[in-house]
Amino acid sequence: MGKIIGIDLGTTNSCVSVMQGSQPTVIENSEGNRTTPSIIALTKTGDRLVGQAAKRQAITNPKNTIFSIKRFMGRKYDEINDEKKLAPYEIINEGGEARVKINDKIYSPQEVSAMILQKMKQTAEDFLGEKVTEAVITVPAYFNDAQRQATKDAGRIAGLDVKRIINEPTAAALAYGLDRKQTSEKVAVFDLGGGTFDISVLELGDGVFEVKSTDGDTHLGGDNFDQKIIDYIADEFKKQEGIDLRKDAITLQRLKEAAEKAKIELSSRTDTEINLPFITATQEGPKHLVINLTRAKFEALCADLFDKILDPCRRAIKNSKLEMKEIDEVVLVGGSTRIPKVQALVKDFFGKEPNKSVNPDEVVAIGAAIQGGVLKGDVTDVLLLDVTPLSLGIETLGGVMTKLIDANTTIPTRKQEVFSTAGDNQTSVEVHVLQGERPMATDNKTLGRFHLGDIPPSPRGIPQIEVTFDIDSNGILHVSAKDKATGKEQSIKIESSSKLTDAEISKMKEDAKEHAAEDQKRKEEIDTRNIADSLIFSTEKQLKELGDKIPADKRPVLEGSLEKLKEAYKNGTVESLKSAMEELNKEWSEIASHLYQSQGPESSQPETAAQSDSGEKSKKNSGDGNVENAEYEVIDGNDK
């Protein structure tokens, strides 16, 4: 049986971890980094880039580069008005669902997230040296049922059996408390990431991690701080030059990168210069953007965002039934907690210095890996008791939401309640399932609807309809309704608002596999072309440097083989390139043997193109698409 990996599928960055014995290990990706940008790009040549490679080309390819896709997971098109304004890529309405359109192809948010998850899966497989099929994936604690189901669907598309969906603050608490199982303390986990904010209050003791309450805001994170800076520098430039830089997608992407960089710098400095040369041009010539941004100005720009942080904190403490003074530690999680103002707010609100002992970028993935270890049986003496973040209920007479399960109820849980008909001789009822805290049904999130029919005609109030809500350990809801008189029952597993069917998910899984094969084929082609390019370069170089040392009868043959390789490089297939390289290498081998014999065994043998590029280089770079040309000098045996 293989390992269960832990994945933090973040708005800005993602991270993967796995249990190695009794300790979790964060896995470095192929670029050597412990986190991977949650960015996807589709190039004009059809290549699909994920992570750092996608981020590097974002400025020149903004409309085909997808970032912050997590903000659209499990949400309807009419629910994302604010988010879609921040995206330079095209977001369309397809049957009420939010979709991304790139190069005339339409992708669901789950499909895009699956591309990121595939990268995480591959990273783990490279590290472990074995196939990975199971994972624990984290979500913001305040994600609703539809968003959780969408995350699970993304995992399935990526070829992963998602064993558990776990809340990010809870995962962080697991990582924080793994070595503190014998202690008893009450902890607040303050998680401010790239796109979401969560606050969870937990009680840790004797290996039990019990969530007392959770609250948050799924529209608040680092992206929002970046946008404040973008608007500020764009407005300042417009005042000076009369040009709105936000109207051009490439320029907007430059502003986004500069804003993110400035925000990060202001965490360690009190001021920073935003310098973007040649940001635009007029008839008068090029224009440059140079603006100094102080930390005080940044804090003033984001004052409303900082204010929004405290309300969820107040609700979480109130719902936990704990006093502020009972909180032993406040653990900071998420990259945005590095902002000094955020740390100051936390200190003032909780009346104590926040705990910075965990890596805010990695701790969530570590916690997910620990949960994977618990499910696998590798981690013992750990019991996790999480809660549902929002109340769940149904619509009843008058459009009222009647709650069956209150927010912050420990999961898994099951609740039953008996309802009746609203009219005489009513033979069917519609069960409208809702999630939220508002008293009226229309103000809450619709999770699903289903009908229970064939109810025997009776006066209103007589039929007994038993409604059962069942939340599993992933926080995903199952609802059933049963006519107690006839025993007839209808049930529904609440699906994501994305409405992805099993057939659609299966098709997306096949597409993902095809892309993986295409990516491998493309990588092989690039590797082969890089080796061929190096062989052409080094052959030409040695032909010139060795001169008449090459036998006169061999030179035309060698030059002919070189021309064949050049032609294959311009117009040929991978197979023709390999064939031409093999032929050229064979010629070089014969020449190298001749030179060695003519110079004698005491002399240094000239380093041939066949040896330097086709031989050793192909071995070294067979698994790396980024082949670099190596320059070298031919050492004549007489010149030392």
UniProtKB/Swiss-Prot annotation:
- Indicate the family of this protein: Belongs to the heat shock protein 70 family.
What is the stated purpose of this protein?
Acts as a chaperone.
One Gene Ontology molecular-function label? ATP-dependent protein folding chaperone
Show the ranges annotated as biased composition (Acidic residues).
630-640
| Induction comment | By stress conditions e.g. heat shock.
Composition bias (Polar residues) maps to: 595-613
Q: Any idea what this protein is called?
A: Chaperone protein DnaK
Q: Which gene encodes it?
A: dnaK
Question: Which Pfam families would you find in this protein's record?
Answer: HSP70
HAMAP family for this protein: DnaK
By its UniProt entry, which InterPro entries does this protein fall under? ATPase_NBD, Chaperone_DnaK, Heat_shock_70_CS, HSP70_C_sf, HSP70_peptide-bd_sf, Hsp_70_fam
This protein's source sits in the domain of life called Bacteria
Gene3D superfamilies attached here? 1.20.1270.10, 3.30.420.40, Actin, Chain A, domain 4, Substrate Binding Domain Of DNAk, Chain A, domain 1
The UniProt annotation puts the region (Disordered) at 487-526, 593-640
- Where Phosphothreonine occurs, the residues are T196
Q: Does the keyword ATP-binding apply?
A: yes
Source organism per entry reads Pelodictyon phaeoclathratiforme (strain DSM 5477 / BU-1)
Q: Which keywords are on file for this protein? A: ATP-binding, Chaperone, Nucleotide-binding, Phosphoprotein, Stress response
Q: Where is the composition biased (Basic and acidic residues)?
A: 501-526
Residue stretches spanning the membrane? none
